[in-house]
Amino acid sequence: HSVSASSAPYRLSDALNRHIPGLKSTLLLRRRKEIDGLEIHRTPARRATDALRRHLAHGFDILLPERRKDLPFSLNVLGMGFDTAQMEKADVVHLHWIGGRTVDFSQLCHIRRPLVYTLHDMFACTAGCHCTMDCGLFQDECRGNCPQLGAPRLFRNIPAWLFSRKRRAFGRIPSLTLVTPSLWLKREVERSCMFPGRKIVQIYNPVDTDLFRPAENRNAIRAGLGIPPGAFVIACGATGLFNPVKGGHFIPLVLEEL
């Protein structure tokens, strides 16, 4: 079971369909994945635009050779278009993980339905980084020398331009509610000037309690896994656990303190 941000909409859609009578949740994906019990549609492929986006990203790396490669930074320029007619039957459109090159933010205003946007990192409220790593420039429209890009003086206005472009796109959306899975992320979004006047709500990610529940025979399961009955066990996991953003490097330090 994946613990990445991309798995959250699958769990949510499944929970809504199973537990709320009369509600129908379907998924619109860039890359179609077959999931049992879920109705999934795919956005039309645009190979020429996809190729142009890849070349643009490559040029971005050439212009900014000092950019931190261990931290993601997404341009969101020439993002993927989509057919809004696919969403006309919906009462609410819920956006998940539209960062990077997946969606052209400037087209979101054409969706004539209330939008809910669940943020799984800080990308939506910055110029393009997914975690600020304690940089406070996102509170001032990312004006200044971005520590993640390490841009030469000629290109130091790129983050401010990206921030302004994204803010204009969000500002044109008639109805937009923001959701964060954690209180920390909610507070970070509130510190940004990306979403003035927008409602921000904290809602935890759903967990399938039919799957993740206390075991009926704990000792038998431990024995099957080779874990002593009285052992103290700490479980942790993430996609890219030792990415600086995920904090996996703190695990040995925590264990030393126990």
Predicted segment positions?
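N-terminal subdomain of nucleotide-sugar transferases
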Residues: 1-42, 88, 111, 174, ...
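Carbohydrate-associated surface elements
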Residues: 184, 206
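Short aromatic-enriched loop/helix-cap "lid" or pocket-rim segments at secondary-structure transitions
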Residues: 36-42, 107, 127-132, 137, ...
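A short helix/loop element that forms part of the nucleotide-sugar donor recognition site in Leloir-type
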Residues: 163, 213-227
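Conserved donor-binding/catalytic core segment of Leloir-type glycosyltransferases
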Residues: 227-246, 252-255
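A short, charged, and often flexible helix/loop element on the N-terminal side
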Residues: 38-80, 150-158
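Membrane-proximal helix-turn-helix segments that form the acceptor-binding/catalytic region
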Residues: 110, 123, 138-179, 187-198, ...
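Short N-terminal targeting/anchoring amphipathic segment
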Residues: 82-102, 114-120
